[in-house]
Amino acid sequence: MGQKTHPTGFRIGINKSHDSTWFANYGTYGEILKEDYKIRKFFENDWGTLYNKAGVSKVEIKRKVNQLELLIHAARPKAIAGTADEESTFSTLRAQIKKLTNNPKQTRIKVIQVNKMETESVLVARALAEQLEKRVAFKRAIRLVAQRLQKSGTKGFKIQVSGRLNGAEMARDEWVREGRVPLQTLRADISYATARAYTTYGVLGIKVWIFNKEII
């Protein structure tokens, strides 16, 4: 039976990088790793409404000796940094982040614009999950997302939805693919993400692969 590798992990150090960048001693590694986990869960859960409204694709965490830097990649950065009370938003966010970390450090926050939502599989998977949770028929939801991706100029994509589709008794997989998605080509820039849609019939699993370009 063939084994599948994670498209992102397979390319770490080639055309992908870690979302967390820091070094730690043996004794402090576990504690810092736990802090990273808490920070990411804070953005997803406690900060969830603004997180989704801004279209946050990822949060990079960089650490220096006395500094913690957060790089927030967002499709709509003005939802975070374009308001009249921008400084107040950042001040509140810094205070909440400091509560999650044991060592008091200078916290820097930077918001980075995501140029195209369609190139980020995280945002595509999340948008599809929202449609399915609103009881949109899964074939229609997939078709709408596929049409957006076709217009965006990506070289290829694959979308898969698994579970009790439209309330069927038997769980099954449905998928659609357009163009090329070369998972074994290391120079291929593949954006991969998963999401869950919580429906009245159960949980639907979503997987999205997007082939943006080749990096030589």
Curated annotation (Swiss-Prot):
UniProt superkingdom: Eukaryota
GO biological process, one term: translation
Main localization, broad class: plastid
Pfam families assigned to the protein according to its UniProt record, in alphabetical order: Ribosomal_S3_C
UniProt-recorded Gene Ontology molecular function terms: rRNA binding; structural constituent of ribosome
Gene3D superfamilies xref list: 3.30.300.20, Ribosomal protein S3, C-terminal domain
Subcellular localization, as worded in the UniProt entry: Plastid, Chloroplast
GO terms under cellular component: chloroplast; cytosolic small ribosomal subunit
Residue ranges occupied by any KH type-2 domain in the UniProt entry: 43-115
Entry keywords, A to Z: Chloroplast, Plastid, Ribonucleoprotein, Ribosomal protein, RNA-binding, rRNA-binding
PANTHER family, alphabetized: 30S/40S RIBOSOMAL PROTEIN S3, SMALL RIBOSOMAL SUBUNIT PROTEIN US3C
Family: Belongs to the universal ribosomal protein uS3 family.
Assembly description: Part of the 30S ribosomal subunit.
NCBIfam families: rpsC_bact
Protein name: Small ribosomal subunit protein uS3c
The species this protein was found in: Emiliania huxleyi
Gene name of the record: rps3
